[in-house]
Amino acid sequence: MKKLLTLVFSVAVLSFCGCAEKGAQVQAAGGVAEPTGDVSTYLRGAYISASDAEAKLKAAGFEVLSTFESVKDGKTIAFTCPTLKAEGAKPNRANVAVMRLFVDEQDKVIAITNPVYFGKAYMQKEYNHALFSKVKAKIESAFPSLKDSEDKMSFSNLAGFHFMIGMPYYEDVEVLGEGTTAELIAKAKNYKKGADVAFELKLSDDTTLLGYALGGGTKRFVSKIGRQNAGLMPYPIVISGGKATMVKAEYYIALSYPLLTMMEFGGIASVPGDIIKDLNKPFK
């Protein structure tokens, strides 16, 4: 990883392509016009406690899966709904099944993952704007006065996003282990007596999405590059098709931190490898 970054940094700025697309933009599904400009990564709002946030989500019809300490004085609430689960049950789309609400008890704000942003990134050509815009509207109804984050990306670039030349796309997953779905889930839950499993969401007989804690040393990168986006933790693991996989950290971190520069990414160059080591352990 470090060698790759050194090589990338040595080339001209023209080699940078953080918003590169892979494939043509598709027409909006469901008869609802898709955004034509930038889409915010998060919806930010005034501080409320984690318990109050959970109550609001449940009242709006969302299913709260867990509340996880993602950073010191900060909690991530993982939540879903029938629409997200149905979309996540489609082949290679499990990551879209869960949205996150980060409660920052230090800076007294909340941040919610934007279903339109992550929906387009994870669903790609199968994205249905009518569905994901309704999920977003339901969130905004439950949490009035939310504002778009400064973190954002052009909607048309989300489906084919990768950080730069040589970096992975969404589909370039890391295989953590192989076996039956039941065997892989059991391994994840038996490791450390299940202490690192933040949530478990069954999407079909063959597919389950886990939220998994990283090691204490590994997860410090969040505070280094910006605790405001700590909702990316716990790390998602997909168990499907006889494999446990994770989206590559170079992709997941850059998607969650679209304002991250090459120099800032270079400052956490060892993190992608450390994440693989952490998440490989349960499946050995």
Task: Report each predicted region and the residues it spans.
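Bacterial N-terminal signal peptides
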Residues: 8-15
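Positively charged n-region of N-terminal signal peptides that target proteins for export
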Residues: 1-4
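Hydrophobic alpha-helical segments and helix pairs
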Residues: 110-147
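Terminal, regulation- and interaction-focused segments at domain boundaries
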Residues: 26-71, 124, 144-208
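A cross-kingdom marker for long, charged
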Residues: 208-284
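Charge-dense, helix-prone N-terminal extensions
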Residues: 60, 79-83, 91, 95, ...
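Bacterial Sec-dependent signal peptides at the C-terminal "C-region" and cleavage site
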Residues: 16-25
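Mid-chain, structured segments of secreted extracytoplasmic proteins
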Residues: 75-114
